[in-house]
Amino acid sequence: MAVEWAWVKPVPPVDITDCGIFLEAPGGCVVMLLHGLTGSPTELGYIAYHLQYRGRYPVRCPRLVNHGQPLSVLAQTSWQQLYDSAKEAFMDARQESRARNVPLVIGGLSLGAVLCLMLAAEFPEDVAGVACLSPTLFYDGWNVPWVHKLIPLMDFTPLKYFAYFREDEPFGLRDEVLRGKIAAQYNKSSIHESGHSSSLGYAHFPVRLFCEMRHLISRCKRILPDVACPVLLVQAEHDDMTSPRNSQYIFDHIGSTWRELVMLKESYHVITADLERATVAAHLQRFCESVIEMRDGSLGPVAEDATEAEANA
């Protein structure tokens, strides 16, 4: 990641017709998945279609507030707006799960995982399980620039309004083919064009948005003991943005007695689209099946230890 300094001309919001991925199926639970910061529902597409086709689950992948809008609009997003956006989507999914009389499983990638943990703590009676995919509590991956450590200081200065990280290879992906497609798209992007994102997300990350993410993370850490439902954690050993420390921290601090930690060997941060996306989808499907069995009374809570073998199961 490289740092770019610029004043991005404000532009009005645009009408977003693509509100996310919404798949119908008659299965035994409702699944809601949330994308990451500056990402899009597209990064969850493979997992969503797998769960619909293999698990026969209805899947909801909403677009978080201001994602898909011009960069100047996205940069003004507060952490409260992000959480309220997730909560609004959650309420819709909860209503559907109640209407179907089936459990609700929620999950997310990176920021999406943080939001889902917060929802699970606030609505313990409504969340049957949480899947955390590359959860982000610490930006400590091997590709995070040293200047990222200055964000806590920049949060108290006007500098945060003019600083942007430009996304660089590997873009959170070990898959070289997909990485090449993203590079071709991002190379066409200029920070001063201030255009809306493509289905591949934004080429620039507003530092101000990272500052807001810090506030979400601090709140998420505080509520971890209140998360009592089953939790699945999946992370890559070589995650370029967030090290395995993130999943281990959650594993060690959540209140749930049913928790499982899966480590992947051939992926980077965006595990939902990378080389082991099929493995991730299979683990999430199995997790949903376990949640359904627990509700039916045929499977009691089991505490799972963190083992590398899980990744190859």
Can you say where each PLM-predicted feature lies in the sequence?
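Conserved alpha/beta-hydrolase "acid-adjacent" motif
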Residues: 240-246
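Short beta-strand/loop motif that positions the catalytic acidic residue
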Residues: 227, 233-235, 239
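Alpha/beta-hydrolase-fold enzymes
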Residues: 111, 118, 122-205
